[in-house]
Amino acid sequence: MVGGGAKRRLRGEGPQCEKPVDMKKSKSCEADVPGDLRKEVESHYRLPLPEDFYHFWRFCEGLDPEQPADSLSASLGLRLVGPYDILAGKHKIKKKSASLNFNLHWRFYYDPPEFQTIIIGDSKTQFHMGYFRDSPDELPVFVGTNEAKKNCIIVQSGDNVFAAVKLFLMKKLKEVTDKKKSSLLKTIDEKLTEAARELGFSLEQRTVRMKQRDKKVVTKTFHGAGLVVPVDKNDVGYRELPETDASLRRICGTIVEAPSDADRLQAFAPVQEMMTYVQFANDECDYGMGLELGLDLFCHGSHYFHKVAGQLLPLAYNLLKRNLFAEIIEAHLANRSQDDVDQLAA
């Protein structure tokens, strides 16, 4: 039978602005963005957004007051999208924006419900950055990047958007040979670094808060960003899958490459067996097991796993009281596209 889950440390949420002062509700920490605009963004997405989201918008307004969303296009090839489209008023131009599902807006093929795109880059690789939350009622735990045309891997890039863009910029700076371009990047880097320092945002790729989260990760999952679920002192909350990641990948490969439907059905047997284990796990409140299997099958990407992922994931999210994530995965699986991700496109 399957084993118990990994131990979990106490949950610790760090302040959003890491300044050496009491940060309970420091006004200096709050970006100058109108309250009604904040409400509009958060009501469309039904997700809380961290203060760095708004501060970065103000920073981009400083670079280009007319087109803040495109202020990094010429220099870095980056564009602010997703919830930033609401700050830019783009949703007001679209006639039927009221009926749009914003949680599918810029949701790329491999983006799990935990991931919310805020910046896009090279369209050839579908590079994008997004906030990653473990639960829809919590603030993001880090900013991740993914290249959807390549794979499902989510790379952790700091715990705020300033850090993620800084890391991207530093990489770009190493690749640039043109002096003029290099000079432009250095100027932006100076402004970005100064703004982050003034606001108290860490520019580290892996902050203390992110390392604290690592201790709570029960399993890495195929996307590599890790899975965090509540596990009590008796180890209830998660149990391991009976297959390693490598063997699960092999099983998935055998299913996808099966020469006939009969062979495919046969190759599905280990997955069916794991689904039975998940039912036992759910009965005993180890909800993390079904979530892990569902996410792994979703991240594998083949349409052959959409039905199974559609059975496992909404149930797991609802059992974990992450109901919005259940809604997102159902909508995404029903409209999973490799290209049409801009919901506001005409």
Curated annotation (Swiss-Prot):
GO terms of biological process kind:
DNA damage response; DNA repair-dependent chromatin remodeling; double-strand break repair
Keyword Signal among UniProt keywords: no
Instruction: Specify the domain of life of the species encoding this protein.
Output: Eukaryota
Q: Name one GO molecular function term.
A: histone binding
Q: What Pfam families does the database record attribute to this sequence?
A: HPF1
Location in the cell: Chromosome; Nucleus
Extent of Basic and acidic residues compositional bias: 19-29
Assembly: Interacts with PARP1 (via the PARP catalytic domain). Interacts with PARP2 (via the PARP catalytic domain). Interacts with core nucleosomes in a PARP1- and PARP2-dependent manner.
Q: Which family does the similarity line name?
A: Belongs to the HPF1 family.
Q: Which PANTHER family match?
A: HISTONE PARYLATION FACTOR 1
Protein name listed in UniProt: Histone PARylation factor 1
